[in-house]
Swiss-Prot record:
The modification Phosphothreonine is found at residues 11, 54. It holds the Pfam family Aa_trans. It is a multi-pass membrane protein. Its main location: membrane. This is Sodium-coupled neutral amino acid symporter 1. It comes from Pongo abelii (Sumatran orangutan). The lineage of its organism: Eukaryota, Metazoa, Chordata, Craniata, Vertebrata. Disulfide bonds join 245-264. Belongs to the amino acid/polyamine transporter 2 family. Glycans are attached at residues 251, 257.
Amino acid sequence: MMHFKSGLELTELQNMTVPEDDNISNDSNDFTEVENGQINSKFISDRESRRSLTNSHLEKKKCDEYIPGTTSLGMSVFNLSNAIMGSGILGLAFALANTGILLFLVLLTSVTLLSIYSINLLLICSKETGCMVYEKLGEQVFGTTGKFVIFGATSLQNTGAMLSYLFIVKNELPSAIKFLMGKEETFSAWYVDGRVLVVIVTFGIILPLCLLKNLGYLGYTSGFSLSCMVFFLIVVIYKKFQIPCIVPELNSTISANSTNADTCTPKYVTLNSKTVYALPTIAFAFVCHPSVLPIYSELKDRSQKKMQMVSNISFFAMFVMYFLTAIFGYLTFYDNVQSDLLHKYQGKDDILILTVRLAVIVAVILTVPVLFFTVRSSLFELAKKTKFNLCRHTVVTCILLVVINLLVISIPSMKDIFGVVGVTSANMLIFILPSSLYLKITDQDGDKGTQRIWAALFLGLGVLFSLVSIPLVIYDWACSSSSDEGH
């Protein structure tokens, strides 16, 4: 994906200047619903999030505290697309293989539309409270508990993304090194062991970058990451017409024709023990919510309607890209596809695959520090240790990287990362938090009865998603072995 949702989250959430009186839109459309200069909301009382809408106050804010956005609609679409795109794209073909084409299309379409709706709820909450940062919005509505919950959800999502990126390094770097050495894929040595390589990369490259006081150019790696994934999509489509369907070895009781027909025929609806990972993987692929409000705050002539248009365009573009990657990846390998689609492409003399593999590896290595910076900053914020201290900065960085490496080494498959993060933090950020915030903010508004019913149903859907998916994922772990994918 690659998601690289990271660049925006970090540069915007951590380095963006947010005015004390959170943003007053310079688009007059934001104030058409207001009469007599007031909003009937108990959340307006706090000065840090208040928007007094009298003309004189608006003029004052423009002069001293209000900072208008400067980013065009097109660039905002690009930024939000960067925020959506991540490593989840590598797992979508596996999700399709375990649901079938029709069921996958229904799930992908549903999550896309529901994600757009959740962003609409988030924008309404931002407009009502004036908050332009997700964590501050949670604190404004639910107090310290809300702040902690949102910090926890975003940190878990970013940690899951880091795990998936380092898992890509663990999976793909050995193949790239073997190719450059002219060795077969079966070649074995300590210097092509993914577990060793991920530790070397982490402490040789990622650690020094994570120790930097600020990100600098790393905040702009998301554009490179998105380019890498567009390149990956092109290669996936191209390889579909180059790689023949792989037929497993036959035993004496099965004929070649029947096996080939069964293996190389697309399935439209499939249900098995791995189907449970489909929805969490798709949800993981669409999480971008912590970046929405910072992008909104930077949008030129911003309004809720304009930001919703940015959201609609970005999600539609990612929907097309995700579906193409999933369908062409599936039609190349059918039931043999793995949860890391890129790892399935092997070829001793295939320069094109080597190129895309190296591009993705470089992209994820440069993206991990961006996500790491956000997680570490969140921890320091929660601990109220925001003043820079080199010793604490170094110790916390090393401890977090050691823990992350231990998890990456022990995790058998990328689907496990998608499954856990998808049913927990992704579900919280897409379904539960936006609907909960909206219901709390509008609990005194009798004019929004219908909208509140839809938001309540949306919240119930998120809770149901958790209650069903979490036990099924745990059950699959208990019943399955990592040998299912040959890792």
